[in-house]
UniProtKB/Swiss-Prot annotation:
Name of the protein described by the UniProt record: Cobyric acid synthase
Biological processes, Gene Ontology terms: cobalamin biosynthetic process
UniProt GO molecular function: ABC-type vitamin B12 transporter activity; catalytic activity
Active site: C329 (nucleophile), H427
Gene3D superfamilies in the record: 3.40.50.880, P-loop containing nucleotide triphosphate hydrolases
Length: 485
C-alpha cells in the first residue's frame, strides 16, 4: 500500500481537481485507489453508503475511483454555522458545535479518527490518494495539524505541491511555501505541478528550469487551463454558464449567508434551457418563473436575513403573479408556519415565524437524518433520486399533499393546494433528468429535455484523467504510488 498526498500553495490551487484526475488515471490502469481528505471545511456534503456525510469533493473523487462514497474518505468534516464556529462531524456523524479554540483542543481526538480511517483505507486499497486543505504554510495553524504536513508526517507519505499559475505569482507561491516548511517537511515534497496554464509553454520553460535548480525539486508537469470544466465547486458558488439559445426558463436562487449544498443547482446552471441567477446580499430578486429557497446550515438566522433583504415581499408578489416557489431542505422549513430550535442546534435556542406558505411546522432535533433515497415526484410521477441531510422534523396538515413518495414507504415534503409552492427535504433532485423535466414543466417551460448530469460529470472526470496522461510525468507518478513501470 502507498499513500500519496497532494497539497496546495493556496486555497483553490487545484488540489481537489488534481486528486480527482489522479484517481481516475490510476483507476483506468486497474489500480485499486481510494480518495482521502483528513479534514475538510465545507457546507456542501454528500451522504455515504454507510449512512454518514462527507465533503462533496470526496464523493466526486470516489466516483473517479469507481467507488461508493464512504465516511472513511473524509473522517473530519467542519460545517461552519457562524463566523467563529462550526459543526464538527467525525466519521460521518455530528459530535458537537465548537468555536475555533474548542476545536483546537479537540484536534488530538480528531487526529486519532483521521489515522483510524486512513489505516482502514490502507488495508483495502493499493493506493490512497490524499488531498490537503488550504496551504501547509499557514504558520498559525501548524500546531496539532491534521490536514496537511501534520498528517503527512504521521503516516510518512510523499507530497506533491500544486500551484495555480492563472492567478499569477506561481513561483513565489511554490518557493515561499517550501521555505516556510520544516526541513523534514521540505524533504517530503517530491515535486511540483503547475495548474491552469494558458499560453506558449516554451515561454514558461526558463522559469521551470530555474525552479528546479533553485529548489532541487522536479516539476512533474504543467496542466493547461481546461475550459468548460464543471465539476462541483466545494466552497464558492460557481455561477459560470455555457452560452444558451432558444426558449429558456428564468430561475432565481435566493442565497443566504449559510447556504448549504448549493451544488443542487449545478444541473440548472448547465441546463441549455434555464437562465439561472443567484441573488445575493443587497440584490433584488429579479422577475423569474421559479424562485428557489435553498438549503441552509442556520435556517432561522437565514430566514431573518431573507426578511432583512426584502425578499419575503418579493416572494409574495411573485406568487400573486402566478410564479412558482420551491424550497429545498432548510428552504422547505422556511416555507412553513414555525421553526423551533429548543436545543440551540443552529444558534441560540428559540423559535421563528416562517413564511406560512405551507401548513407545516418544524422542530430541530439532535439526531440528523442522513440517507440516500429514491422515489417519485407528485408532479407527473417522475422518478427521482437524491439524499437527505437535515436535523429538522416537519409535521402538519400540509404533509397530506406530499411532494414525493419514496421507495422506502415514506412521503416527503409538501405541495400547496394551489400547486404554486413545493417543498422537499431532497437534495440533488435536479440531477435526475425525468424529475428535472417535470419540475421545469411545472415552473412553465413547455418543451424540455434535461441533460444527463451524471454523464456530464463522468465526461469531465475523463477529461481530467486525459490531462494527467498527456501533461504529467507518468513514470514518476507511478513510482511515487509504489507502482512499477
Amino acid at each position: 500500500m502507498t499513500t500519496l498526498m497532494v497539497q496546495g500553495t493556496t486555497s483553490d490551487a487545484g488540489k481537489s481537481t488534481l486528486v480527482t484526475a489522479l484517481c481516475r488515471w490510476l483507476a483506468r490502469q486497474g489500480v485499486a485507489v481510494a480518495p482521502f481528505k483528513p479534514q475538510n471545511m465545507a457546507l456542501n456534503s454528500a451522504v455515504t453508503a454507510d449512512g454518514g456525510e462527507i465533503g462533496r469533493a470526496q464523493a466526486v473523487q470516489a466516483q473517479a475511483c469507481g467507488l461508493a462514497p464512504h465516511t472513511d474518505m473524509n473522517p473530519v468534516l467542519l460545517k461552519p454555522d457562524s463566523d467563529t464556529g462550526a459543526q464538527v462531524i467525525v466519521h460521518g456523524r455530528a459530535v458537537a458545535c465548537m468555536d475555533a479554540a474548542a476545536y483546537h483542543d479537540y484536534k488530538r481526538v480528531a487526529r486519532e479518527a483521521v489515522l483510524a480511517s486512513h489505516r482502514r483505507l490502507a488495508e483495502r486499497y493499493r493506493v490512497v490518494m490524499v488531498e490537503g486543505a488550504g496551504s501547509p504554510a499557514e504558520i498559525n495553524l501548524r500546531a496539532n495539524d491534521i490536514a496537511n504536513m501534520g498528517f503527512a508526517e504521521a503516516v510518512d507519505c510523499p507530497v506533491i505541491l500544486v500551484a495555480d499559475i492563472d492567478k499569477g505569482g506561481v513561483f513565489a507561491h511554490l518557493v515561499g511555501t517550501l521555505a516556510l516548511l520544516s526541513a523534514s517537511e521540505q524533504a517530503r515534497v517530491e515535486g511540483f505541478v503547475i495548474n491552469r496554464f494558458r499560453g506558449d509553454i516554451a515561454l514558461l520553460e526558463p522559469g521551470l528550469d530555474w525552479l528546479e535548480t533553485h529548489t532541487g525539486k522536479p516539476v512533474l508537469g504543467v496542466l493547461p487551463y481546461l475550459h468548460d470544466l464543471h465539476l462541483e465547486a466545494e466552497d464558492a458558488i460557481d455561477d459560470r454558464q455555457p452560452a444558451k439559445t432558444g426558449e429558456r426558463l428564468k430561475v432565481a436562487v435566493a442565497v443566504p449567508p449559510r447556504i448549504s449544498n448549493h451544488t443542487d443547482f449545478d444541473p440548472l446552471r448547465l441546463h441549455p434551457q434555464v437562465d439561472l441567477v443567484f441573488v445575493g446580499p443587497g440584490q433584488r430578486i429579479p422577475p423569474a418563473d421559479l424562485i428557489v429557497l435553498p438549503g441552509s446550515k442556520s435556517v432561522r438566522s437565514d430566514l431573518a436575513f431573507l426578511r432583512e433583504q426584502g425578499w419575503e415581499a418579493a416572494i409574495r408578489r411573485h406568487l400573486r403573479y402566478g410564479g412558482k416557489l420551491l424550497g429545498i431542505c432548510g428552504g422547505l422549513q422556511m416555507l412553513g408556519g414555525r421553526i423551533a430550535d429548543p436545543l440551540g442546534l443552529e444558534g441560540a435556542p428559540g423559535e421563528s415565524r416562517g413564511l406560512g406558505l405551507l401548513d407545516i411546522d418544524t422542530v430541530l432535533e439532535a439526531e440528523k437524518q442522513l440517507r440516500n433515497v429514491r422515489g417519485r415526484l407528485a408532479l407527473e410521477g417522475a422518478p427521482v433520486s437524491g439524499y437527505e441531510i437535515h436535523a429538522g422534523v416537519s409535521r402538519g396538515a400540509g404533509l397530506d399533499r406530499p411532494a414525493l413518495g419514496l421507495d422506502d414507504g415514506r412521503c416527503d415534503g409538501a405541495l400547496s393546494e394551489d400547486g404554486q409552492v413545493l417543498g422537499t427535504y431532497l437534495h440533488g433532485l435536479f440531477e435526475s433528468p425525468a424529475a428535472c423535466d417535470a419540475l421545469l414543466r411545472w415552473a412553465g417551460l413547455r418543451e424540455v429535455a434535461s441533460p444527463d448530469y451524471h454523464a456530464l460529470r463522468e465526461r469531465d472526470i475523463e477529461r481530467l484523467a486525459d490531462l494527467v496522461e498527456a501533461h504529467l510525468d507518468g513514470a514518476r507518478l507511478r513510482a511515487l504510488c509504489g507502482l512499477s513501470g
